[in-house]
């Protein structure tokens, strides 16, 4: 009998050309967005010398992304998904060209940066939702865990490398280089995506877009399984907002500027390890219980993080959080795709991604408020242990999720 390895199996990239094309496009896109993510705040800070203006740009882009995810979910369930993906990517690239041209002006327009941020945030999220809804058709539902782990690893590696490349470009050529290369990278992603097969949505009756979106909300609220998964995802994202306390905690631990970087790298590193060692997750007979327990463990890690007497122990707690949150996120992704009807995939993926964006913003705001009333150590611990209490209550309440069982897929020689 063949045994499934703990290590992530990358064979999906060899056996599924469509997924390989998506993988390549996603990696290039992550690097391009990383260049953009460095350039926009730096340019606004240089123009205004105001952190408030920088924060406003992030808020506006986040709001546009939220709306785009809602609209994209409806479009992905009504129109051919490949066309939605290509349209969204191409339109994003036009916005990046606009940012590049604006940066080349003798006096760049701040209003143009804000408006193009709204443009790019909206259209980028359209493509994300359509791609998520199309993934089961590209790889098969039995391979969703493997596809999700490969995607997570790609995102983590790209997120680590692209800001460093962006910073180097800023030092060499200025923000216009970042915007120009981000635009070029975005248009390059269209080449592999053009090779995708047609991805028609499932047949369904025509209805008003708002009514269609409300149907997605109703399904989410009426399904204790899918609704519970989405709720856990939101809470997990709130916990990750602990990063807003890193500078204050670094002062408490008397860390040097170089050492602070370890705090920011710990969660991505832990998540990458979680993705690399996810080989057996798809074969769990009780994924719902495993999801709940890994989420509780991640909350406990955040609660203990601020209490550590040495910063290196805090880094270990953050890495543990990254690993456990990766396990929970992979299970969330897989169960959401497999337990959602095909006709609802676009809307439910849009709502799930949107609550992740919202959870991060809410978590950052709550931690900022706690930080104004409590010490950084107390704020971090209160957030972690508070979420742990909520998680324990959900463990008791989400009975269907806790008892959910699946038949593990058959292990073949190619999987081991």
Swiss-Prot record:
It is found in: Cell inner membrane. It comes from the Bacteria. GO terms for cellular component: plasma membrane. Residues 43-55, 105-109, 178, 240-256, 308-313, 378 are periplasmic. Its main location: membrane. Keywords: Cell inner membrane, Cell membrane, Membrane, Transmembrane, Transmembrane helix, Transport. PROSITE patterns: MFS. PANTHER family: ENTEROBACTIN EXPORTER ENTS, INTEGRAL MEMBRANE EFFLUX PROTEIN-RELATED. NCBIfam families: PRK10489.1. Component of an export pathway for enterobactin. This is Enterobactin exporter EntS. It comes from Shigella dysenteriae serotype 1 (strain Sd197).
């Amino acid at each position: 009998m063949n045994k499934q390895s703990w290590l992530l199996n990358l064979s999906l990239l060899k056996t599924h050309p469509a997924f390989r094309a998506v993988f390549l496009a996603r990696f290039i896109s992550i690097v391009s967005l990383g260049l953009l993510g460095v350039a926009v705040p730096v340019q606004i800070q240089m123009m205004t010398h105001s952190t408030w203006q920088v924060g406003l740009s992030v808020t506006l882009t986040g709001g546009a992304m939220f709306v785009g995810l809602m609209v994209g979910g409806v479009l992905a369930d009504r129109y051919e998904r490949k066309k939605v993906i290509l349209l969204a990517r191409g339109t994003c690239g036009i916005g990046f060209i606009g940012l590049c041209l604006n940066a080349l002006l003798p006096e760049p327009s701040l209003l143009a940066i804000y408006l193009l941020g709204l443009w790019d945030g909206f259209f980028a999220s359209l493509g994300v939702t359509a791609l998520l809804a199309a993934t089961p058709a590209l790889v098969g539902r039995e391979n969703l865990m493997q596809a999700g782990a490969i995607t997570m690893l790609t995102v983590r590696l790209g997120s680590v490398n692209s800001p460093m490349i962006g910073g180097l470009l800023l030092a060499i050529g200025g923000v216009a280089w970042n915007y120009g290369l981000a635009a070029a990278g975005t248009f390059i992603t269209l080449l592999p995506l053009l090779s995708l097969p047609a991805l028609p949505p499932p047949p369904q009756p025509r209805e008003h877009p708002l009514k269609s979106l409300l149907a997605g909300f109703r399904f989410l609220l009426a399904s204790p399984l899918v609704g519970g998964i989405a709720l856990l995802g939101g809470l997990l994202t709130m916990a990750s907002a602990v990063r807003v306390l890193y500078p204050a905690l670094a002062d408490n631990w008397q860390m040097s500027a170089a050492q602070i970087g370890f705090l920011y790298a710990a969660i991505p590193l832990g998540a990458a390890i979680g993705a690399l060692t996810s080989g057996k997750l798809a074969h769990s007979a009780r994924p719902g219980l495993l999801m709940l327990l890994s989420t509780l463990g991640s909350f406990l890690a955040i609660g203990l993080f601020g209490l550590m007497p040495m910063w290196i122990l805090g880094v270990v707690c953050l890495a543990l959080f990254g690993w456990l949150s990766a396990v929970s996120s992979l299970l969330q992704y897989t169960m959401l795709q497999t337990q959602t009807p095909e006709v609802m995939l676009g809307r439910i993926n849009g709502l799930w991604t949107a609550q992740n964006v919202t959870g991060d913003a809410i978590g950052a705001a709550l931690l900022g408020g706690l930080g104004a009333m409590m010490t950084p150590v107390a704020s971090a611990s209160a957030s972690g242990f508070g979420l742990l209490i909520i998680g324990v209550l959900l463990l008791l309440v989400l009975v269907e999720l806790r008892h959910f069982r699946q038949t593990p897929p058959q292990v073949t020689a190619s999987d081991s």
